[in-house]
Amino acid sequence: MTVININEIMTHLLPGQTIAGLDLGTKTIGIAISDMGLTVSNPRPVLQRKKFTEDAHRLIKIFDHENVGVIVIGLPLNMNGSSGSRVQATRAFVSNMKAYTKIPFVFWDERLSTIAAERSLLEMNVSRIKRARRIDSAAAAFILQGALNRIENLHS
């Protein structure tokens, strides 16, 4: 497993592979998977966090099932661009995943992704209870969609 730049994604993907998006929280992990054409991000059920080893095994199972070739993970920078404790936790998570997968990771600035996801769910009239259950995967989909749009712009 390695960390790559968004510009390198296409050189790491094999035909038919997808890209995963992750929104790492303290209690949950939001997950999204791209379509095969790498144009649309699709949210998946939220993973309730347990112990790291168990989380890693459950994620790897999902990545294998979805034929994931690259993982885009949200980097929760502060609004001024500085790194806080959540950035350190995200980097540590990716570093710890080295023992479980060779799939490369891409860090993606996730500032305002949860707010955008919340607005989107509100516009769809999703109830407060359902929003709470879906917000992290919606944020993961927002993160992944931003990366997919960037990839499309790089290759057009």
From Swiss-Prot:
What InterPro entries does the annotation carry?
A: RNaseH-like_sf (IPR012337), YqgF (IPR005227), YqgF/RNaseH-like_dom (IPR006641), YqgF/RNaseH-like_dom_sf (IPR037027)
Q: Name one GO cellular component term.
A: cytosol
Pfam families, per database record: RuvX
Among Gene3D superfamilies, the record links this protein to: YqgF/RNase H-like domain
| GO terms of biological process kind | rRNA 5'-end processing
Q: What class of enzyme is it?
A: hydrolase
Q: Name one GO molecular function term.
A: nuclease activity
- Secretion signal span: none
The protein's location, in the record's own words, is:
Cytoplasm
Q: Which UniProt keywords apply?
A: Cytoplasm, Hydrolase, Nuclease, Ribosome biogenesis
- EC numbers listed for it are 3.1.-.-
The protein's role, per its UniProt record: Could be a nuclease involved in processing of the 5'-end of pre-16S rRNA.
| Protein family membership | Belongs to the YqgF nuclease family.
Among HAMAP family, the record links this protein to: Nuclease_YqgF
- This protein's name: Putative pre-16S rRNA nuclease
Upper classification of the source organism reads: Bacteria, Pseudomonadati, Pseudomonadota, Alphaproteobacteria, Hyphomicrobiales
